[in-house]
Design a protein with these regions (language model features):
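N-terminal ligand-binding lobe of clamshell/alpha-beta domains
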Residues: 1-304
Length: 304
C-alpha cells in the first residue's frame, strides 16, 4: 500500500501501526519518528522558513493569506502523480495547521488520481483514539490499532482515576501569545481529565482569541504555555518575554510559580499517539504532588 500523510499526527499514527515502509509522502513538518524525515515531501508552506518568526509575525502573515483567500500550503502535484497513492490522510480541522482535505480532493481530480482520502478531524481525546482505529481499518492493521488504542485508553483512565480524587485547579492552556489564544478542540478536555478547570476556552471548539486583561480576571492557578507548533526551547523563550506583561505576572499561577512551557509540537498540537504523553504532562503541571514528573525535555517551570 502507498500512503501519503498530509499532517504530522497522521504520520505518527502510520508509524505506530508499523506502516513506515508504506509511507510514500509526508509534509515538511513530519519529523517524528526520525525516519519520517527521509520520506519524499509533498507539502510545503508559503510561510518563510529561512528565519524564525515571532508569534506576532506569524499571526500577521497567516491573516494576510486568509484575507487574500490564498492557501498557506502547496501540494507537489507532480510528486503525488508519480506516487499514485492508495490512501491519503488529510484534515479539515484547521486551515492554518495543514492542507485542508478539500484542497487535496481538488488536486486529485485535476490529476485524475483515484486515491482514497480520509480526513482526520478530532475534537476530543476519544476522537483522536477513534482516528487511530480509522487508519487501522483503512490499512488492514485493525488488530494493531485496537491494541494500541486499548493501551492509550488505559493511560487515560489512570490519569482520570487519580485526578477525580483531587481538587480541580483553575488552569489556562495558552496556545498562542501575540495575540493570545486559549487552546481549543481536544485541549480543554485534556485539562479537565488531568484535574483542572479549563479557563477561557470551550471544549470541542476552535482555539479562542482572548485578551491579557481576561487572563488576569480569570485568575488561573496554573498556566501551561503550549504555542502551536513550538518545541520546548522556543516556547520557553517566548514565555519568558511574556512576564514583562503585568497581566501575566500578577496571576495566582505566576505568584505560585505554576507557569510552565511545554513541547507543544510533540505532545499537544498533534492529535496522534503522543497526545497521551501530553495528558500526563498536564496532569503533573496541575497536580505535581500526585503524578510522576515528566522528562525535562518536555516541560519547564518558567519563573519571572
Amino acid at each position: 500500500m502507498r500512503i501519503v500523510s498530509l499532517l504530522p499526527s497522521a504520520t505518527e499514527i502510520v508509524y505506530a501501526l508499523g506502516l513506515g515502509n508504506d509511507l510514500a509522502g509526508v509534509t515538511y513538518e513530519c519529523d517524528y519518528p526520525a525516519d519520517a524525515r527521509s520520506k519524499p515531501v509533498v507539502v510545503e508552506t508559503a510561510l518563510p522558513q529561512d528565519r524564525p518568526l515571532s508569534a506576532g509575525e506569524t499571526d500577521a502573515l497567516v491573516a494576510e493569506f486568509m484575507d487574500r483567500g490564498e492557501p498557506i500550503y502547496s501540494l507537489d502535484k507532480d510528486l503525488i502523480r508519480r506516487i499514485q497513492p492508495d490512501l491519503i490522510l488529510a484534515q479539515d480541522l484547521c486551515r492554518v495547521c495543514a492542507v485542508p482535505s478539500g484542497q487535496v480532493t481538488d488536486a486529485l481530480a485535476e490529476l485524475g488520481c483515484s486515491s482514497e482520502v480520509i480526513s482526520l478531524d478530532p475534537n476530543t481525546l476519544d476522537e483522536i483514539l477513534e482516528g487511530i482505529l480509522t487508519v487501522g481499518r483503512a490499512t488492514g492493521t485493525e488488530p494493531k490499532a485496537t491494541e494500541l488504542v486499548a493501551d492509550l485508553r488505559r493511560r487515560v483512565d489512570a490519569v482520570r482515576r487519580t485526578a477525580l480524587r483531587l481538587p480541580s485547579i483553575g488552569t489556562l492552556a495558552l496556545e498562542w501569545s501575540d495575540p493570545p489564544f486559549a487552546g481549543g478542540h481536544w485541549i480543554p478536555g485534556m485539562v479537565e481529565t488531568a484535574g483542572g478547570t479549563n479557563l477561557l476556552s470551550i471544549a470541542k471548539e476552535p482555539s479562542r482569541r482572548i485578551t491579557w486583561p481576561a487572563v488576569a480576571e480569570a485568575m488561573p492557578e496554573v498556566i501551561v504555555f503550549m504555542p502551536c507548533g513550538y518545541y520546548l526551547e522556543d516556547a520557553e523563550n517566548e514565555l519568558e518575554s511574556l512576564f514583562a506583561l503585568p497581566y501575566l505576572a500578577e496571576t495566582p499561577a505566576a505568584r505560585g510559580r505554576a507557569v510552565f512551557a511545554v513541547d507543544a509540537s510533540s505532545y499537544f498540537s498533534r492529535p496522534g499517539p503522543r497526545i497521551l504523553d501530553g495528558l500526563e504532562i498536564l496532569a503533573w503541571a496541575i497536580h505535581p504532588e500526585s503524578f510522576p514528573e515528566p522528562p525535562r525535555d518536555r516541560i519547564t517551570r518558567v519563573i519571572a
